[in-house]
């Protein structure tokens, strides 16, 4: 979320219901780690609830380690995935990948680290500097900021991927069920952006003006509210909340509608 916070967040909320760019059951591959019992259970449940065919579940045997070396990532995750797609004639069909394992979540080589979804999306990137909340040149791609909807055909091989995992299977099932309940509902509510005491995250604050422009452009009935506060407290019908705090207080006091987007805009989550 750090790369395109304002674009990804607001476009998702305001116009996602108007555009369908793949990512349906037949375009999704679920990747499970057979070395994690919970990974397999979550993967099967997600596939069943979303109507994803059993043939679209890829079983891998990945070591239980938080950080995987780049060579091992290539041989144990990326190469087997591409081989699976080629073997089953799915390379031109699959546009979305869902990892249901907890570990690994980072890829490392020569002191450089990428998140596993980042490395999977557009390949491992070497970052030669540490920009404060800025996108380094190595992280740029032609899809970022584009007005063209994402498809595997026009995205130069980029692979949309996400990690789906929680502390317990029951929690994961609850999240999956909530996402299903949100499908096509277009609920009413308010999207919040917070200007917090974390000054490093507040550099994005000026970009939120663009979100108001997008809201007016698409004539959305979604309410937006910007606050100078470290937290939301006891709000109802929360559609979205973006905060610069890694551990925002009172978060559980709020009523998030099914399908709501929440992000602490930090690297705290790995």
Where are these regions (language model features)?
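Bacterial N-terminal signal peptides that target proteins for export
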Residues: 1-9
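Tryptophan (W) side chains
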Residues: 9-10, 20
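N-terminal signal peptide c-region/cleavage motif recognized by signal peptidases
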Residues: 16-18
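Cysteine-dependent hydrolase recognition
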Residues: 22-270
